[in-house]
Amino acid sequence: MTVAKRIIPCLDVDGGRVVKGVKFVDIRDAGDPVEIARRYDAMGADEITFLDITASHERRDTMVQVVEKVASQVFIPLTVGGGIREVADIRRMLNAGADKVGINTAAVARPEFVAEAAERFGSQCIVVAVDAKQVSRADEPARWEVFTHGGRKATGLDAVEWAGRMAELGAGEILLTSMDRDGTQAGFDLALTRAVSDAVPVPVIASGGVGTLSDLADGVLEGGADAVLAASIFHFGRYTVAEAKRLMAERGITVRITGDERTDV
């Protein structure tokens, strides 16, 4: 049985509002997270990912409240990332209604945290976010480095090797973002996506750079991704999830079709 590929709208949340920037800067407001999540649920999105891009301790309660409100009205899986640093953070988000949590900086600081989290809560709800930037020259074999803190801090870690290590430690999925492509609408970094997809035994979610519906299909067919994540093309009404799934199905990709997806919302 072929597993359906997933379309996952991503909501970057700052101070309780959805925003979307270009290369993680130049942020603009895209609306209320609860209303947007409800819309995506009705449109047939397979999952929703929330990324708390500020994630300060002072504003943590705001994100918990957002998750609680969304979980009470939306009935597809929710992943929450940003500021997940310890077991208590994971428990708090899961108790608020999240189905999965995304771990990024804390995994780099203390890789064993991923193993502890997977053992405590199960690999199925642990997503390790890998933000990667190409560091090789044009005349060299492609090489990508892991960055943290919203792409501001280099780690010296090889992104492909790091993704493999995270899977070994218990990550159930890898959320792979190309920092070079994020917000550019130039398409996924397919070489990066393929390299990581080939290197890990767990699902890879491709992120960063979607500008057209064809980019989503390319992420699966050329990049080998199990799921594709996008923000701007959906947030600002350029395309609907239903249109994305129709295009992917036309290109031979198995997707989940529900009654709601047959009519655009």
Swiss-Prot record:
It is an enzyme of class 4 (lyase). The active site is at 12, 131. Pathway: Amino-acid biosynthesis; L-histidine biosynthesis; L-histidine from 5-phospho-alpha-D-ribose 1-diphosphate: step 5/9. One of its GO terms (biological process) is L-histidine biosynthetic process. GO terms for molecular function: imidazoleglycerol-phosphate synthase activity; lyase activity. Keywords: Amino-acid biosynthesis, Cytoplasm, Histidine biosynthesis, Lyase. The keyword Cytoplasm applies. InterPro entries: Aldolase_TIM, His_biosynth, HisF, IGPS_HisA/HisF, RibuloseP-bd_barrel. Its EC number is 4.3.2.10. GO terms for cellular component: cytoplasm. CDD domains: HisF. It catalyses: 5-[(5-phospho-1-deoxy-D-ribulos-1-ylimino)methylamino]-1-(5-phospho-beta-D-ribosyl)imidazole-4-carboxamide + L-glutamine = D-erythro-1-(imidazol-4-yl)glycerol 3-phosphate + 5-amino-1-(5-phospho-beta-D-ribosyl)imidazole-4-carboxamide + L-glutamate + H(+). It is found in: Cytoplasm. IGPS catalyzes the conversion of PRFAR and glutamine to IGP, AICAR and glutamate. The HisF subunit catalyzes the cyclization activity that produces IGP and AICAR from PRFAR using the ammonia provided by the HisH subunit. Belongs to the HisA/HisF family. Heterodimer of HisH and HisF. This is Imidazole glycerol phosphate synthase subunit HisF. It comes from Alkalilimnicola ehrlichii (strain ATCC BAA-1101 / DSM 17681 / MLHE-1).
